[in-house]
Amino acid sequence: MKAEIIAVGTEILTGQIVNTNAQFLSEKLAEIGVDVYFQTAVGDNEVRLLSLLEIASQRSSLVILTGGLGPTEDDLTKQTLAKFLGKALVFDPQAQEKLDIFFALRPDYARTPNNERQAQIVEGAIPLPNETGLAVGGKLEVDGVTYVVLPGPPSELKPMVLNQLLPKLMTGNKLYSRVLRFFGIGESQLVTILADLIDNQIDPTLAPYAKTGEVTLRLSTKASSQEEANQALDILENQILDCQTFEGISLRDFCYGYGEETSLASIVVEELKRQGKTIAAAESLTAGLFQATVANFSGVSSIFEGGFVTYSLEEKSRMLDIPAKNLEEHGVVSEFTAQKMAEQARSKTQSDFGISLTGVAGPDSLEGHPVGTVFIGLAQDQGTEVIKVNIGGRSRADVRHIAVMHAFNLVRKALLSD
């Protein structure tokens, strides 16, 4: 089934609102195996909408129109679709009853004739009840093309799609997806390594997406069941993770988790809870961002002892008891300072782990180090590890954000090695 989404509303074309409905619809249709080939926005104009319907009817088997179902004069979607199909508009009894109840409960509201339009559907259409609003939707098949009209407000459209439309469209295979998350490898390198798999993909498919500091791979397949999909996705996942970088490192070393909502921070917090271990932090360039990220998760009082924000040399010395002369000798941006910050954070809070971040966020260099130079220390029973990362060519905010991601990844690896 080839689907097309037509968003009706001049406010979309003028940029007054963002068409989030198209994204939502495309995602939900993909989940049931319906491919969206076209997305279009058109203003509140009958002539242009008629022209677009003519084009859509020739190239798509499912045409979904969103918006323009309200009571005002510029709400003309149903009227225009009826004219295009040569059909009349009729009243849906359930929608009329909902209008009656709505105005009966609001005696101060004037029930003007244009309000009745919200209860109309194209003749022959299956009504799609509106759970949160008054404008009824509809689904109608004519000459092999299925036409659907949906309200524009997302609060009305989403429940109508989830509870009314999708169950009526679901036939055959569905689309199942799995998201792999990678850190420490760039999109260009990952795509180059996986070039053969990407170039020769049919089903299942894989698609890379770059985000700040990380890369995700979406694996998708059409199948009749989750079990069938898992078999296909497992094979592709293993093919991906068995690949190696140019340096001979397995991609398994860079894959840290699954899913849209997973993050390095969430992985670390859950693993600390599972192992019953605690962590403390001492931060310089990130100014508490690591600690704030930990605190975003509920129940972290069991794993997060506290921390220090020591931006200046003086505060590093005062709060962490690191001799100022040693800091001056080695520099605040150094392996020595990262080591001592991590060790003192751990010691002072009696935590299992002490993490530290010190470096150059920008825009100016510091102590001869270019912007993006970051030292991260991790102190634990087995000793202290310090890594140096270079996050060049980024904004100040990105340097700090990615530095925190590196810190979480360092903790993650330590937890997994235990």
UniProtKB/Swiss-Prot annotation:
Source superkingdom: Bacteria
InterPro entries: CinA, CinA-like_C, CinA_C, CinA_KH, Competence-induced_CinA, MoaB/Mog-like_dom_sf, MoaB/Mog_dom
CDD domains (alphabetical): cinA
Similarity-based family: Belongs to the CinA family.
HAMAP family: CinA_B
Matching PANTHER family: NICOTINAMIDE-NUCLEOTIDE AMIDOHYDROLASE PNCC, NMN AMIDOHYDROLASE-LIKE PROTEIN YFAY
NCBIfam families noted in UniProt: cinA_nterm, PncC_domain, PRK00549.1
Descriptive protein name: Putative competence-damage inducible protein
